[in-house]
Structure formats: structure tokens, C-alpha cells
UniProtKB/Swiss-Prot annotation:
Belongs to the purine/pyrimidine phosphoribosyltransferase family. PyrR subfamily. It comes from Limosilactobacillus reuteri subsp. reuteri (strain JCM 1112) (Lactobacillus reuteri). SUPFAM superfamilies: PRTase-like (SSF53271). InterPro entries: PRibTrfase_dom (IPR000836), PRTase-like (IPR029057), PyrR (IPR023050), PyrR_bifunctional (IPR050137). It catalyses: UMP + diphosphate = 5-phospho-alpha-D-ribose 1-diphosphate + uracil. A motif (PRPP-binding) lies at residues 99-111. Its EC number is 2.4.2.9. This is Bifunctional protein PyrR. Regulates transcriptional attenuation of the pyrimidine nucleotide (pyr) operon by binding in a uridine-dependent manner to specific sites on pyr mRNA. This disrupts an antiterminator hairpin in the RNA and favors formation of a downstream transcription terminator, leading to a reduced expression of downstream genes. Also displays a weak uracil phosphoribosyltransferase activity which is not physiologically significant. The lineage of its organism: Bacteria, Bacillati, Bacillota, Bacilli, Lactobacillales. Homodimer and homohexamer; in equilibrium. One of its GO terms (biological process) is DNA-templated transcription termination. GO terms for molecular function: RNA binding; uracil phosphoribosyltransferase activity.
Length: 178
């Protein structure tokens, strides 16, 4: 049975806090680009951009990023054949930009590592920062978020699920013991 950790209002407050932190830690927001990791990271990135627009009256580009080709745990039947890299995946130029990579949950760090590999194939940003709604710990790689909505310590046998209205039809963050 899932236990609710954050409701929709708490999620919005966490995203607003992240937005303020982004403004405070950057000298201006003109060079920012949000890249959301599919699926729910894209919706969170769009919300951050919208909130930033409300606060600073500036349009920040948002692009979705599919990291499935870059995962180190995906099955490749023919190990001699490298996956085809879609360098035109982003519809915005990230070269010389400050990219804020957005994801819903940070766990082992493997998804973020895959996203970093993908981004480096698509351009050369001046800086990459990581914003996550939930950091649940248990890192397997030396990856640390720059902006965190909520730290939620978990056990390895628990699952954290983020639901967003745009995709799931409701909003909350739940934790489930498997």
C-alpha cells in the first residue's frame, strides 16, 4: 500500500522553492535552458519555467530528453553495434548555455549519468545543474543534485512514485514498500 509523502500543494511549494533557489544561485536567468528527463521530469521542467516566467518575466526554453539509448542497464542483443545517437533530439541549442537538468526522483544516479552522456553528445553547455523533486538516496554514482524539492530517506525495497496532473491525472508523491 502506498503512503502519501507530498500532496499536490506541497509539490507546488517545493517547485516554487527550487525556482527561487535557481534565481538566487544564478546571476541572471538569461542563459538558462531547462531539460526535463522523460517522462515526469519534462512536466516538472515546464512548471519551473512557468514559475520562473511569473517571477522574472522571462521565457526559459524547455526541452524533453529521452535517455533510454544511454542507459547502461538496457539490453543490447548485438554488443558490436553501438546504438544510434540522435543528436538532434533536443529542439533547442544547449551550447554555451546553463542547462538545468530536471528529473522527478533521484535514486542511484544512473538515469542522470545517462542524461549527462546524452547532453554532451548534443552540445557543449557552459554548466549543467541538476534539479530533482525528490532525492531518495542510495547513490551508486557520485552524483549530487543542486536543487532538491524534498529529501526522502528510503529503504532499497521501497519505491517512490511522483504523479503529475498532466500525465497521471492527479498530483502526489507516494512511497510504497515492496
Amino acid at each position: 500500500m502506498a503512503h502519501e509523502i507530498l500532496d499536490g500543494s506541497s509539490m507546488q511549494r517545493a517547485l516554487t522553492r527550487i525556482t527561487y533557489e535557481i534565481i538566487e544561485q544564478n546571476k541572471g536567468v538569461d542563459n538558462l535552458v531547462f531539460v526535463g528527463i522523460k517522462t515526469r521530469g519534462v512536466y516538472l521542467a515546464k512548471r519551473l519555467a512557468k514559475r520562473l516566467n511569473q517571477l522574472e518575466n522571462v521565457e526559459i526554453p524547455v526541452a524533453p530528453l529521452d535517455v533510454s539509448l544511454y542507459r547502461d542497464d538496457r539490453h543490447v542483443p548485438d554488443h558490436t553495434q553501438e546504438p544510434t545517437v540522435k543528436t538532434d533530439q533536443l529542439d533547442i541549442d544547449i551550447t554555451n548555455k546553463h542547462v538545468i537538468l530536471v528529473d522527478d526522483v533521484l535514486f542511484t544516479g544512473r538515469t542522470v549519468r545517462a542524461a549527462l552522456d546524452a547532453l554532451m553528445d548534443m552540445g557543449r553547455p557552459t554548466r549543467i545543474s541538476l534539479a530533482v523533486l525528490v532525492d531518495r538516496g542510495h547513490r551508486e554514482l557520485p552524483i549530487r543534485p543542486d536543487f532538491v524539492g524534498k529529501n526522502i530517506p528510503t529503504a532499497m525495497n521501497e519505491t517512490v512514485h511522483v504523479a503529475v496532473e498532466e500525465y497521471d491525472g492527479h498530483e502526489d508523491v507516494t512511497i510504497e514498500h515492496n
